[in-house]
Amino acid sequence: MFEWMKNKKAISPILALLIVLGVTIVVGAVFYAWGSGLFNNSQQSTQSALEGTTSTITYAAGAIGVGVPKEIDVEGDLDLTYPTPDYKLSHLTTTDYGSYDERLIVPVPLTLENYYDSTLTNVKIESDGATEVAGLTLKKITLNYNGQNYDAYLLCTNDGTPFKGILNRTGIYPDATWTGDDGNNYTSVYYILAPNSVTGVAAVDGSKDLSVTTAKKWPYSQNDVQSMRLYAGGFNNMWYACAVNGSYSSWTNTLTATKFIGWNTAQAFYKYKTPIDAKFYTSEWDVGTLHKGEKVSKEIFFFFGSSMGFQEEPSGETTVKIPVKVVSDQGVYKQVDVNIVLKDRL
């Protein structure tokens, strides 16, 4: 029945399918330093049950290299660590306009390298998520504004397509025109996470801490503030904002914007009872084809929100374990856990 397994050449692609990753993330401090990365390059052999069979095969542990930023992997053990976290996740609070929900996006940077002598195809990173935690689809882009370029992230649907239209707590409206509170019509509305110094849309009082102490005075105006952020290293957080009357080029991966507003951003991903924005959640991120010796970098994103039911532990510190694995047309990598530690100001 398993005659093909006696042929070493026939199972060679399967030998490439190992990923060893122990990821512990304590949200805070330095995050976005890729550096040269550290790669697990050992060639020792080990044993693993072939998925879907009762047979056992031997494979090379160093067939796939996994890199993480060296500044946060000081021991070279593929374990992400933030020894002095400076960020906190606040409680769900109440404002004059209703509940105020903190929403947090945590990126997990990975670098994969194919050390094997053949190509791996249709490589994907997959996750079943965790209780009350969702994978979010974002695309790193260049944001062009007033002739200057900035790093930013563009919100995409779960198939990786940049979203253009209206997104708020009432629904998702692709390619819709937005009539603002000023009476003007806005078209080509894209949703981005970018530095607040560029967009002018930021957390209340520009607080570096996620806990917003002035939530009860939440203003509804052109620069309507809101709380959803993406950690991008140190205090260089990126805030959620709308780029209106913009244009996106897939050729250059650039979004050109002329105006940023905050209308309705406070309501997006505030789920209430119906997950209307689930269109942006995903359980897998495409990596593509890995040729022999090829190295690629990939970020995956996890979203936390109190309105989804996510709550911190009474101690003020919560560790969330999220199962992650890598698959390809040639087989399945070993499943690992990504550990994200969130801290709350009690």
Swiss-Prot record:
Establish whether keyword Signal is in the entry: yes
Signal peptide residues are 1-28
Q: What is this protein called?
A: Uncharacterized protein MJ1402
Q: Which UniProt keywords apply?
A: Signal
**Species of provenance:** Methanocaldococcus jannaschii (strain ATCC 43067 / DSM 2661 / JAL-1 / JCM 10045 / NBRC 100440)
